[in-house]
Amino acid sequence: MCSSVAAKLWFLTDRRIREDYPQKEILRALKAKCCEEELDFRAVVMDEVVLTIEQGNLGLRINGELITAYPQVVVVRVPTPWVQSDSDITVLRHLEKMGCRLMNRPQAILNCVNKFWTFQELAGHGVPLPDTFSYGGHENFAKMIDEAEVLEFPMVVKNTRGHRGKAVFLARDKHHLADLSHLIRHEAPYLFQKYVKESHGRDVRVIVVGGRVVGTMLRCSTDGRMQSNCSLGGVGMMCSLSEQGKQLAIQVSNILGMDVCGIDLLMKDDGSFCVCEANANVGFIAFDKACNLDVAGIIADYAASLLPSGRLTRRMSLLSVVSTASETSEPELGPPASTAVDNMSASSSSVDSDPESTERELLTKLPGGLFNMNQLLANEIKLLVD
């Protein structure tokens, strides 16, 4: 029976989004995983938490209950567009200071709260980015009309705190920018970005969990607009992706320090990619349907692997080795760097199969020559099979 008295694994979310598909699916998957592995589990809503510092020590109360056994891993889902450093991030920092392993960590979430902050983190690492300008002050949009002209028109204009494709414009010329300056809300700054014409109305959404690409989806606008977000009526379809594209998504995830993220890549005529955005609170309802994946289940598996349990650690270690062996034995999916991205096939198989299926399939073939090369690994595999 699953207990919440001394929970090892928590799911922490926000009341405003807890009924959304990703949160409900992650809760389902975590409950199932913890019951399967006989792990203690607790679901917590952000506004139930009271933070304490008593006698110089950090403490925690939930709905009046003094917490004495702290979670080892906390899966975090907070609405990044509305994240407040004085409340939400304070709770996450408190848990992290108490020794809890958060996924994602508070700094990783902050790296994605503001689109320009994301680019600041990625700059200097050799990551291909569209040229981008922003500004200080609260109402300096108008002064950027001249400053950003070097980016050439048309240019992309985005609210740095926007989400789901909202508050994104394609400015035709300086007059259009001037009109926008009178229409937009100025609570958050805007960024001005070089337009990648060849990727108009389409991009590639890559979901990365634990430093591994779990799947990729081509998103296309259906009404001619620049944004391809499924929440705005765009359609998503499973696609293959070149090794360059996969490695770029993993690199971005690593630089930003994210355990779970969605990376959006813009496509160029020469088959290369540049980064559009990174999402710490990635949605995956369209992704699950298009790619026939259970992203929540993959997240739950990874969360369990972070617990200090020998069996779980060996299991995910094996999964990593199996995945590497599988990837190196198959031909590269997606267009090579010299081929236009238009050749990406929406009917191709997914980049990475479901981790559980991959593991089960390969375990049935053991012992094989590859695994006999390492006796220690073979012993661990035998433990799992038994």
Swiss-Prot record:
Residues bound to Mn(2+) 1: 264, 277
Residues binding ATP, per UniProt: 158, 193-203, 219
Region (Disordered), start-end ranges: 325-359
Keyword set, alphabetical order: ATP-binding, Cytoplasm, Ligase, Magnesium, Manganese, Metal-binding, Nucleotide-binding
Ranges of Low complexity composition bias in the record: 338-352
Cofactor binding annotation: Binds 2 magnesium or manganese ions per subunit.
Binding site for Mg(2+) 2: 277, 279
Pfam families given in the database record: RimK (PF08443)
Catalytic activity, EC: 6.3.1.17, 6.3.2.41
Residues of the ATP-grasp domain: 119-304
Top-level class of the enzyme under EC nomenclature: ligase
Binding site for Mn(2+) 2: 277, 279
Top-level taxon in the UniProt lineage: Eukaryota
Catalytic activity: citrate + L-glutamate + ATP = beta-citrylglutamate + ADP + phosphate + H(+); N-acetyl-L-aspartate + L-glutamate + ATP = N-acetyl-L-aspartyl-L-glutamate + ADP + phosphate + H(+)
Gene Ontology molecular function terms on file: ATP binding; citrate-L-glutamate ligase activity; metal ion binding; N-acetyl-L-aspartate-L-glutamate ligase activity
Cofactor: Mg(2+); Mn(2+)
Function: Catalyzes the synthesis of beta-citryl-L-glutamate and N-acetyl-L-aspartyl-L-glutamate. Beta-citryl-L-glutamate is synthesized more efficiently than N-acetyl-L-aspartyl-L-glutamate.
Family: Belongs to the RimK family.
PANTHER family, sorted: BETA-CITRYLGLUTAMATE SYNTHASE B (PTHR21621:SF5), RIBOSOMAL PROTEIN S6 MODIFICATION PROTEIN (PTHR21621)
NCBIfam families per UniProt: rimK_fam
Protein name in the entry: Beta-citrylglutamate synthase B
Species in which this protein is naturally found: Homo sapiens (Human)
